[in-house]
């Protein structure tokens, strides 16, 4: 079993969108795909991200047909905030997240793990999302936006991953400012990262590499 952790430069950048596209691309190649959303905040009645992930996964993996959203999440909280802030009772246990991860790993040959927020989002007081990635020992797909200011956020995220020797790939989700991207961002990416790719082009090729 292999796994891939989908993270981003921040919140509302497109982790769920990218995870769903990758799920479809992998399933189209005959892979048995699973999904895991360790922590979701801003949950009142049902976890929106986990729900849509599970609905899509059920269509391509029978092992997930009988599961509920709480089966593919470890913790949910009503407050839309970083896990440490949303967890007002401080009940998050990393070993519970790892246990869920290993349980779901038995149901697929590749598990897509969607993070919350960005790499330095606090899960507990001294444990961050990037630390969870290290614990899981998984490869990473970093999702970045194309809007003005994203170069700085992208480079900082890359530096964080490199400093911890975490292998990663990255893609651009051109959902914002797609028209201005060619002027305000693309020139730098073309000069420094000529092999960059977006979620609209290159997802199938990336899926073949997993």
UniProtKB/Swiss-Prot annotation:
The active site is at 37. Keywords: ATP-binding, Biotin biosynthesis, Cytoplasm, Ligase, Magnesium, Metal-binding, Nucleotide-binding. The keyword ATP-binding applies. Pfam families: AAA_26. Its cofactor is Mg(2+). Mg(2+) binds at residues 16, 114. Pathway: Cofactor biosynthesis; biotin biosynthesis; biotin from 7,8-diaminononanoate: step 1/2. It catalyses: (7R,8S)-7,8-diammoniononanoate + CO2 + ATP = (4R,5S)-dethiobiotin + ADP + phosphate + 3 H(+). It is found in: Cytoplasm. Belongs to the dethiobiotin synthetase family. HAMAP family: BioD (MF_00336). Catalyzes a mechanistically unusual reaction, the ATP-dependent insertion of CO2 between the N7 and N8 nitrogen atoms of 7,8-diaminopelargonic acid (DAPA, also called 7,8-diammoniononanoate) to form a ureido ring. Homodimer. This is ATP-dependent dethiobiotin synthetase BioD. It comes from Sulfurovum sp. (strain NBC37-1).
